[in-house]
Structures are given as structure tokens and as C-alpha cells.
């Protein structure tokens, strides 16, 4: 039978090891280059990823590659998942959401309920790069997008 004394003693021992474990650094794996993923499978994969890979192959910026690849889907009227071909809400209005994140700086930007703009990923990137905000929604997101071209 465990006593309270034994429980507290064991708890203290666990608590003392946490700082030791926290100071252990993970060894990063060797970078084998960027990875761009597409959840659209074989049918859409090459179409979506090729523009991004072309940018990276010419020593372009990773965020440019991600944005351009996202724009392919957003601008395709036959893709009903996001963007121009996105399905309207219950009021018959297409509202789009997007977010973008940049690992090295931990910066991010996002928009939601964006109307009348075909490339929400590009607007999300503008939010990340040109504001102190992380998330802009609705009419505010639309006004921001129009203000930035």
C-alpha cells in the first residue's frame, strides 16, 4: 500500500528530473531540402506543386513557392474545395479562409470569411508581412485585401 509520504517523495523525484530533461537538446536531422505536400493526390499533385518547385529550383523563396502553389488551387474554378470554385455558404456567398506560416520566424497570418477575393493565401501572407495582426476576418479582411491590391 502506498502512503502519502511515498507518493510525495516519488512526485518530488519526478519534478527534479523535469528540468534535466528540458535541457536536453534534440539533434536536428540533416536537412535534405524543402518538402511541399499536396493532399490532392495524383490528379492534382503535379499541377499544384510544379509552380512551387519551379521557384525553389531557381533558388526562390520558400514562401513564394508555397503561395504560388496555393494560388493554383485557389484560382481553379473546377476545384470546389477552396478559392474561385469554392462552394457558397447558406446565403449563396463564397467566403474563403486561408492561413500561412513561416517556420524559421514563427510568423503567421490568416484571413477568414473573405469575400470577392480569389487568392486568400496571398492576403494571409500580406497580413503576416505587413501588419502586427495574425488574423483578419470578414469586411476587414476584404478592405485590407483591396487596400493592398
Model-derived regions: residue spans:
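Alpha/propeptide regions of enzymes that mature by internal proteolysis
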Residues: 2, 9-17, 27-149
